[in-house]
Amino acid sequence: MESRKLISATDIQYSGSLLNSLNEQRGHGLFCDVTVIVEDRKFRAHKNILSASSTYFHQLFSVAGQVVELSFIRAEIFAEILNYIYSSKIVRVRSDLLDELIKSGQLLGVKFIAELGVPLSQVKSISGTAQDGNTEPLPPDSGDKNLVIQKSKDEAQDNGATIMPIITESFSLSAEDYEMKKIIVTDSDDDDDDVIFCSEILPTKETLPSNNTVAQVQSNPGPVAISDVAPSASNNSPPLTNITPTQKLPTPVNQATLSQTQGSEKLLVSSAPTHLTPNIILLNQTPLSTPPNVSSSLPNHMPSSINLLVQNQQTPNSAILTGNKANEEEEEEIIDDDDDTISSSPDSAVSNTSLVPQADTSQNTSFDGSLIQKMQIPTLLQEPLSNSLKISDIITRNTNDPGVGSKHLMEGQKIITLDTATEIEGLSTGCKVYANIGEDTYDIVIPVKDDPDEGEARLENEIPKTSGSEMANKRMKVKHDDHYELIVDGRVYYICIVCKRSYVCLTSLRRHFNIHSWEKKYPCRYCEKVFPLAEYRTKHEIHHTGERRYQCLACGKSFINYQFMSSHIKSVHSQDPSGDSKLYRLHPCRSLQIRQYAYLSDRSSTIPAMKDDGIGYKVDTGKEPPVGTTTSTQNKPMTWEDIFIQQENDSIFKQNVTDGSTEFEFIIPESY
């Protein structure tokens, strides 16, 4: 009997790629069958994913529908939990929110987050700042949550300083080692982890080659040159990088170093290809010429919130990174410029950045006058960039150096590529999503004025413009004084900024907005009540006049409004008044008695005559007017008092009408 072998194969990357694909579908809104409302935010997700990750959702979805509202958790915390469910990672959570995150994880039944406090309690510091001195690493079996705690050793042995263990990733990291480089920063009052600060670096005219300034890169396939980066956990949801020219560094030659730190550096080289999602931000500007293999310098006094993660695909021994301690106590001029800040939402994290050199060549980091680091995507990565939301042509302001700033303002261009899984509110503080209709369709509001509802907007440097084929589906909404223009799939809707009612006609919205502004007032002619709309006043005056305009065609009875007439037709005649056959007649409003007249010539000595029934007719010139008509002096100008006939014992009310407006009332029956 012939023996046969049974072959089994396991794809160790399948679970990660599957989870990444589900996260991308969530970002695009594909196949999402549940909406979770937390505070004022809506989160689209999949029931199967949430129920499999949370015992709370597993029990809730057995009885709940497609819309679920959570009142016991904040939106910021739920966004972190949802990102963990779809990425198996917790990314850059502030330490003051950690207790609330763990408590929310216990309420939702997310086991990993609920028991996250056990391994974290064994770490001496969670701030992420490097400290001098020896620290003991955690035992590999502490906390059975498959939590990987890595301790990196400095490649430069002359430093001799070790760095405390840093929690980098959670769950399986088989055949993957992440390279991290820790920047020791000085104390800073700014504790906002969601803001990234970079320094404005002027190009040096002369550079001296030294061991401290050269990143030696071997000519292996796919080498990677890495400049000043700090560790930060990356999230599958693409973030928005905040780059702010806040510091200015002097340009002596001896200060141009690769990394200016007061402590040791932390390097962790990747030994296997890592799967990266399209969480890339491209910032392309015309770089200044820099000698090869010489990287630019960064200041040694940087805010503690600078955290950049580099995840590179490379072969073993493909990159040799050299970094030593630089000169200490160098003078720096710190310039705060908040106007050039591109802020991000609290949910955002720092994007994955990498420098891509050419094959068999060396590549260095280059900076322009406004310190926009050139970051490109590795060509060997398979990333579906066609599913990304591209926002380009963001004009930057002039930097402190007018010559350099104006040059790159004309020549440079920043292209920001955002995956649609990001929170669109992270584009700026004033942005707000009003519609997410269809696949990969996002409509954003950029307020012009500062108001408490919409936040503070900086239109001069933050209004993006869509590019390419996405121009048809993704458009920006412009805010006016009284409304938003919401563009969805080519159709324009005008949304009132006060009550959020939508209109398809701008004139209808203008008339509606008078309810909030009261620019025009329509007082009742019979009492002291005032109305913001003319139709409101007309409906009210019907009760004074008792006029019955709605007449039933079946029996001839008249009614004061449509509701009474409709109930009469249904109950007495057993008919539907809103059907195809018209069962009632709407008579014109006779209380105003508007004259119907033809064109008047200047030679006419009379005005159109009016009978008692309110029907007017033209009076020929030179003929006697009929009995009951009034005459006027020749060449008398026509006024509103001539058109409207005053009722007996009624006082004349003269309304203050603004210039350019009329007093005609358009009565629309309720059945229309």
Curated annotation (Swiss-Prot):
Principal subcellular localisation of the protein: nucleus
**Protein induction:** Induced in vascular endothelium by wounding. This effect is potentiated by prior laminar shear stress, which enhances wound closure.
Q: Where in the cell is it found?
A: Nucleus; Cytoplasm
Zinc finger spans (C2H2-type) are 494-516, 522-544, 550-573
Query: Position(s) of the covalent cross-link Glycyl lysine isopeptide (Lys-Gly) (interchain with G-Cter in SUMO2)?
Result: K151, K153, K390, K407, K414, K449, K465, K474, K479, K539, K570, K582, K611, K618
Q: Where is this region: Interaction with NCOR1?
A: 1-103
GO CC list: chromatin; cytosol; nucleolus; nucleoplasm; nucleus; plasma membrane
The BTB domain extends over 32-94
Specify where the region named Interaction with CBFA2T3 lies, as residue ranges. 298-573
Where are the residues of the annotated region Required for DNA-binding?
514-638
Keyword check for Nuclease, yes or no: no
| Modified positions (Phosphothreonine) in chain numbering | T251
Motif range (Nuclear localization signal): 471-480
Q: Does the keyword Zinc-finger apply?
A: yes
Gene Ontology terms, MF aspect: DNA-binding transcription factor activity, RNA polymerase II-specific; DNA-binding transcription repressor activity, RNA polymerase II-specific; methyl-CpG binding; RNA polymerase II cis-regulatory region sequence-specific DNA binding; sequence-specific DNA binding; sequence-specific double-stranded DNA binding; zinc ion binding
- UniProt note on tissues of expression: Expressed in vascular endothelium.
Region entry Interaction with CTNND1: which residue ranges?
A: 454-672
Q: Could you mention a single GO BP entry for this protein?
A: regulation of immune system process
Annotated region Disordered: where? 325-354, 616-635
Sorted alphabetically, which keywords does the UniProt record give?
A: Activator, Cytoplasm, DNA-binding, Isopeptide bond, Metal-binding, Nucleus, Phosphoprotein, Repeat, Repressor, Transcription, Transcription regulation, Ubl conjugation, Wnt signaling pathway, Zinc, Zinc-finger
| Assembly | Self-associates. Interacts with CTNND2. Interacts with CTNND1, and this interaction inhibits binding to both methylated and non-methylated DNA. Interacts with NCOR1. Interacts with KPNA2/RCH1, which may mediate nuclear import of this protein. Interacts with CBFA2T3.
What is its biological role? Answer: Transcriptional regulator with bimodal DNA-binding specificity. Binds to methylated CpG dinucleotides in the consensus sequence 5'-CGCG-3' and also binds to the non-methylated consensus sequence 5'-CTGCNA-3' also known as the consensus kaiso binding site (KBS). Recruits the N-CoR repressor complex to promote histone deacetylation and the formation of repressive chromatin structures in target gene promoters. May contribute to the repression of target genes of the Wnt signaling pathway. May also activate transcription of a subset of target genes by the recruitment of CTNND2.
The protein's name is Transcriptional regulator Kaiso
High-level lineage? Eukaryota, Metazoa, Chordata, Craniata, Vertebrata
